[in-house]
Amino acid sequence: MTMELQRPREAAALTLSLLDLTNLREDCTPQQIATLCQRAHTEFGNTAAICIWPRFVAQARAAFGKDHTIRIATVVNFPSGDLDVATVVAETEAAIGDGADEIDLVIPYRKFMAGDESAVAEMIAAVRKACAAPVLLKVILETGELKDKALIRRASEIAIAEGADFIKTSTGKVAVNATLEAADIMLQAIRDSKKKVGFKPAGGIGTVEDATLYLRLAETIMAPNWAMPSTFRFGASGVLDDVLNVLAGGEPAKAASGY
């Protein structure tokens, strides 16, 4: 285990640098987005990104201007995964036009669970085509709904094959979100692919201690110091409070506080 993950302050600093600070509440307001943009800049450094609804991307881009130090991530086909390909491509193109740096795409997981792998491949390929470099594509598998280990593995493989830059566990909108079990399967799929693909657990990561468990798992499966903003993100909101508390010298929280 690397030294960073043995010390809470170092683990907190790493978590901060990997954080997609998220507000995907249905009742999110422009004022909350303004606050989110401000919170992404901390006295200890910046988060990797913010993750917001498409309707707020233009506002966030206006706040950040031409500075892409903190990236703007948004969601498409979210959270249901049920939209048609043309609609999702249009969502993606509009979000990029508004200034999004990263697209978090939900796969049509219900079709996938019914045996339709081609629907997943087609959706990812179409959105991948719409995400010209340097826009990143993160593919949300909704592992808490897939449940089955073989399905999670296969969804990971399809996403990687179709050009995902990251594979992400969850929307945060279902009963079961990120789990270490799903993370283990997804990280092994990344390792076995021998491709440069990142991993993003989302939902239920509320403390530095929670985050450290995922970082240790990534280190075990991938390599020491593998986790960096180009390979690993956390989708969370509440964890920032504990990160800042620990970095300020406070005691780490024990209990997760959710998405």
From Swiss-Prot:
Pathway connected to this protein: Carbohydrate degradation; 2-deoxy-D-ribose 1-phosphate degradation; D-glyceraldehyde 3-phosphate and acetaldehyde from 2-deoxy-alpha-D-ribose 1-phosphate: step 2/2
EC class (word): lyase
Keyword DNA repair: no
Keyword Amino-acid biosynthesis belongs to the record: no
E.C. number: 4.1.2.4
Residues annotated as catalytic: D104, K168, K200
Catalytic activity as recorded in UniProt: 2-deoxy-D-ribose 5-phosphate = D-glyceraldehyde 3-phosphate + acetaldehyde
Family the entry assigns: Belongs to the DeoC/FbaB aldolase family. DeoC type 2 subfamily.
Protein name as catalogued: Deoxyribose-phosphate aldolase
Organism annotation: Agrobacterium fabrum (strain C58 / ATCC 33970)
Name of encoding gene: deoC
